[in-house]
Amino acid sequence: MLGRLLRTNSFIDLLGSFPNGKDDGKGPQPHHEATPPPSSMHMPDELRTLLYGCRKVEGEGRGGEGRGSGTFRLVVAQELGQMMSRDNYQVVLDCGGTRAAVGSGGAEMPLSELKEYIFGSPVRLSDRCRSDKLKLSRGARVIVVTRIFYTGYAGNARRLAVCCCIPEQFLTVVTECWSQVSAWFDEVQDVLMPLLEAEPLLPKDLRVSAPAQVDVLLHKFYRHLILPLHGLLETHRLFLYPADSLDFVTAWFREVFNWLEVKDGHRLKFLPALLGKLRHDAAAELLHNRSSRIVVMSGNVTVANKLIFILSAFLRPRYSGQVHYVDDGLAARNVELKEAPADPKYSSTITSKGWEIPRKRSRSSVLSKSSDETSFAHVFLPSSLRSTNSLQYISSSLNSQYGSYGSWFKKTIPLGHSPRINESPDNTFMHHHTNSTSSLQQQQAGTCASGNNASSVTTSTTPNTNRWSQGSPSISEYEEYPWLGYGTAPSGAPSKSRIQKVNMPRNSNRVHDKKLLHERFVSICGDVQEVDFHTSPATESYGAILEVPILEELSFPSQELLPRYSSYLPTLDPAFQVQACPITSNTERRLVDCMKQDLHNAEYSRTLLISLRSREIKEITITKDPSTKTIVQRTKKIFLNGKPGHVSQKLHEEIHFVDNHLTATWKKWEDPVESEDKTKLFITSFHELMK
């Protein structure tokens, strides 16, 4: 009974409901609630390094002064046809908006100067072509994006303009998603054109004369431009390590073996089915079609992020530049600055007897909080649920959950287990091999706990320092198996794990690789002596002409700009192809709505939907029938009820290959008699799996 009670308290109940963001066409509503914090705020350092290639992303944690601050401005203007008059241009709508609210005024640039940017020279052109232009104003620190168009009537030669002023920090995002910005201009133009059917000019004040159209414009301005640009700029994207990086390969096998042991068990083949699908066609589909996605639904942030890291090994394109590491000398100096204070109550925790459990009851009650609860500090559990002994009594009730392979509490490390202080996860993973099936979990738990022992000394006044006892797990862990992850407290001693020292210079969406940019520039603008150009001689009709060859098929894969692959997000973002999101009642419905919107620019939209609560994998494909113009939705079950669904023979062979390959590699790694180099084993096995 208690197990079912805990299972109903999901992750969403703790955080509250998320806005569904559905485009209902009812106009913009004032949005004053606080922006949800990024999911990476309370992420452990090592997990951040695995996902992002560094512990701290540039521009993170600046609050209102961050990269995404600033006001957007929407201006609609028209030409009156009085070329000799100073009042030839009339502004019919001028409003501003931010991510928190829309409809407020924004006067960062004078209208007189802005009208010059919009319409330019008064000299008229002979054609009536539509034009888009972009200008960066250094003085006002804004990007002026303008659409100039004409009405559909032949006798009306007056120009109309839709202008958007965007903060300059969005420049890289605007150039990346220019097609989406152009589509937004088309939507605004479609709203304004019906107003010109009766009159040759727009009303002087659109807010008074056409309030319904203004509401639609502001709604599209907020939903289709402001929010997508903020999401692309501020959401942290995955860093795809090079496939030949030994540190990445070692960490990847460590997470895979941990998942197979803790999450799948001996019967469930969930991970092999997922990796087999990625190897078969799902990973390549992301490159061929921008409307394809991989979405992981989960109530546990840590578990979802670890699964994202595992499946990221099959994603492309991978980074091919140099991987940067933290200087050992700098890391040592930072540790010295974080030494524990010389206080007796901080220095008496660890004794020669190892890790002890207090036998005497204290009169003062201490509210314990595990690392997994840091993001839910406002949730208070009863003291009975925060006690390890009390949790052990209800383990039999939790055992009856669907897909449970033994009690979660039996998987934890005993309280008397004494970890070694100077071991790191990678060192233990590479050098300790036993025949026990639970050896990997014990090594992982012990070594990760030892990596955080110094911080435990400085942050705890109780003798209980073995964090793997997990005395107070978060409620979401009852639904999905708990993951013995890494502590959120910063490590107090220099770690020997090589992957933890990776420090890629980057911001949320780009890698700062000057060497890579220099190579790209040299390849385009090479040495003048090597360019095959010549000068044709002058004649009586014309002078000498310099002829330079043009490379028409010059193409460079994007390496600085990271692909739109992200980790756990507070809500579904259709702009990202790979992401994880919470499980809500309308997540799948909203996903289908986003896929239907993709059909405006693509022939089909496909999503691989992964549910960690029910351990289901299904592929949703939405197409439009060319003859009837109706939308056709097909759903294919890849994995359900603990086994693969009705899949093709080729996919079934891929799943079987991945399962056998991972099992064989795991057995070789655990076999103490195996004399093969473990490093070479991982590299060879990884490249065979990625073929």
From Swiss-Prot:
Pfam families: Longin_2. Residues 450-469 have a biased composition (Low complexity). PROSITE patterns: DENN_FNIP12. The keyword Transport applies. Belongs to the LST4 family. Residues 17-44, 422-474 are annotated as: Disordered. One of its GO terms (biological process) is amino acid transport. The keyword Transport applies. Keywords: Amino-acid transport, Protein transport, Transport. GO terms for molecular function: GTPase activator activity. Involved in extracellular amino acid uptake. Required for the protein trafficking from the Golgi to the plasma membrane. Residues 435-449 have a biased composition (Polar residues). GO terms for cellular component: FNIP-folliculin RagC/D GAP; vacuolar membrane. Residues 607-687 form the dDENN FNIP1/2-type domain. The gene is LST4. Residues 67-243 form the uDENN FNIP1/2-type domain. Residues 251-601 form the cDENN FNIP1/2-type domain. Residues 21-34 have a biased composition (Basic and acidic residues). InterPro entries: DENN_FNIP1/2 (IPR037545), LST4_longin (IPR041153). This is Protein LST4.
